[in-house]
Every structure is written in C-alpha cells, then in structure tokens.
Amino acid sequence: MRIRIKDLAKLQPDKMAKIALAATPRALLDLYCVAPGQEQKPHTHGDQDKFYVVLEGRGRFRLGAAEHTLEAGDALVAPAGVEHGLVNDGDTRLLVVVLVTPPPPHA
C-alpha cells in the first residue's frame, strides 16, 4: 500500500493532530501534525517502543532527561518505559512519522 504522507497532513488549532496511517497486529504507524507552539506532553509506554522520523519542520524532542532538536531527515527512538514528548518550537508545521511497536491495546 502506497501512502502520500504529506498529502494527509492537517493541523488542528487546539492540539497536535494524530493521523492513523497503517496498523498491523505488530505495529502502528501514525503521522503527527504539530503546529508552532503545540506539544505532546511527556509520557511513557510500559510495553511499546516508539520511533520518530521528522519529515518536515523542526522540534524539540524529550527523551528521558535529555532534549534533542530534530529536523527533517532526523530520527529518534524512545524505548519502552522511557519518558518522551515533543514540542514544535519552530515557526512552521512539524510533521513526524511515528511507529509504535507493539501497538497499544486500544489500537
């Protein structure tokens, strides 16, 4: 299945948009669309690893106690149990492809 990811991107005025791209019994693929100033608050997943790949824009990603600035083409892995989150501190939209494995029970 081919997906034109950037064509699916849409921002929401009040919070980060999370768009489901694909799901299997072993993985979940989402697109996060983050407007300037929006964030995903730090949180943890007990059993899931999360992989972030930045497609467009720039943002600050928290991983444990560390912060990393990522731009288009950069990636970051948040292992299960490690607190993580992100904020768009740029002035353009931030698009991030996110792979979660295994998928959460509600997926």
PLM feature spans:
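Structural motif
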Residues: 28, 58-60, 67, 83, ...
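Short acidic-glycine-tyrosine-enriched beta hairpin
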Residues: 66-80
